[in-house]
Swiss-Prot record:
Pathway(s) annotated for this protein in UniProt: Lipid metabolism; phospholipid metabolism
Protein name: Phosphate acyltransferase
Classification via Gene3D superfamilies: Isopropylmalate Dehydrogenase
One of the record's GO cellular component terms: cytoplasm
A GO MF label: phosphate:acyl-[acyl carrier protein] acyltransferase activity
Protein origin, superkingdom: Bacteria
Cellular localization per UniProt: Cytoplasm
HAMAP family: PlsX
Record's keyword annotation contains Cytoplasm: yes
Length: 345
């Protein structure tokens, strides 16, 4: 199956200096994939000329005259940047010319544009930002990571459904466990919103584990962790900060003396494996779940390797037909709710 991915080639902190080489490397590893690079055509052609032309036949250029700034207000970008590389890339998904879009651009503008152009899946109130994160057992999906600061219990249930289907499609989990992020594992903990959400999750067909705490994300207690965007974003940024602090401490301790530097030299093979295991670039790429099309957000400061992983995730989501799986699961949940309400009346 040939998959075509639309790339916002101008988005991110560096733009085409990252997106173009990343696209070249990605195509070298994925012979059945095509890319549409969206952006300033002369600039893209000049950058492509600097790289290996063997995969050039699988690259199309779609000219776009505008670029969304990283600090631009989402609503202004939506109103005034209708020919931006971001908007055109998402339009290609809507038109069926691409099966997914990837952008390292402004997160708020990307969410607003994607929601406006693609619309949400029937039964989904709001899209959520979902990310696959490493844990001691493997990988888990955490959502929402910042799209929705305040969420109703019904919306959090929808997040649970979407996260469960994403893990089933991308990680092969037959019946992913779902945890609700809370201040404690006991049922009595949390505010009324959390308690209501827990009740809805218990009544659903999901494999609901129960409440989980922040450390359970790293422990891999559940395959999916559901939370509102405020809590999720704080948890994500805290984890990123801790990983950076740990790396700094490690460098400082290994560099204290000739003896510790010698120990570091001896430990290089193990350190290399450790670094690879927690390398944030391998987990670059957050899915905008709940839309009628696949959109993956790369970190704005991602390097070539990181952006390549975001492209790979978009390709994997397109190949697994995750949108259809989410739509089917949500439709079944809505039918069950209607049936329960009818029986209650």
């Amino acid at each position: 199956m040939t998959i075509t991915v639309a790339v916002d080639a101008m988005g991110g902190d560096v733009g085409l200096k990252v997106t173009v080489p990343a696209s070249i490397q990605f195509l070298q590893d994925h012979p059945d994939t095509h890319l549409i690079l969206v952006g300033d055509q002369p600039a893209l052609e000049a950058e492509l000329a600097l790289h290996d032309g063997a995969v050039r036949e699988r690259i199309l250029i779609q000219h776009a005259t505008q670029v969304v700034g990283m600090d631009e207000a989402p609503q202004l970008a939506l109103k005034n940047k209708k020919d931006s590389s971001m908007r055109v890339a998402i339009n290609l998904v809507k038109e069926g010319k691409a099966q997914a879009a990837v952008s390292a651009g402004n997160t708020g503008a990307l969410m607003a544009t994607a929601r406006f152009v693609l619309k949400t899946i029937p039964g989904i109130d709001r899209p959520a930002i979902a990310k696959l994160l490493p844990n001691v057992k493997g990988t888990s999906c955490v959502l929402d990571l910042g799209a929705n600061v305040d969420c109703t219990p019904e919306q959090l249930l929808q997040f649970g459904i979407m996260g469960s289907e994403l893990m089933a499609c991308l990680q092969g989990k037959a019946n992913p466990s779902v945890g609700l992020l809370n201040i404690g594992s006991e049922d009595i903990k949390g505010n009324d919103n959390i308690k209501k959400t827990a009740e809805l999750l218990r009544q659903s067909e999901l494999h609901f584990y129960g409440n989980v705490e922040g450390d359970d994300i790293c422990k891999g207690t559940t395959d999916v962790v559901v939370c509102d965007g405020f809590t999720g974003n704080v948890a994500l940024k805290t984890a990123e900060g801790l990983a950076h602090m740990f790396a700094v401490f490690l460098r400082e301790e290994f560099g204290r003396s000739w003896w510790t530097r010698l120990c570091a030299l001896a430990a290089l093979p193990v350190l290399a494996l450790f670094k690879k295991r927690i390398d944030p670039r391998r987990y670059n790429g957050a899915s905008l779940l709940g839309l009628r099309g696949i959109v993956v957000k790369s970190h704005g400061s991602a390097d070539v390797t990181g952006f390549r992983y975001a492209l790979a995730q978009a390709c994997e989501e397109a190949g697994s037909d995750v949108i259809a799986h989410i739509a089917d699961r949500v439709a079944k949940q809505l039918d069950n709710l209607k049936q329960s309400e009818a029986e209650a009346n």
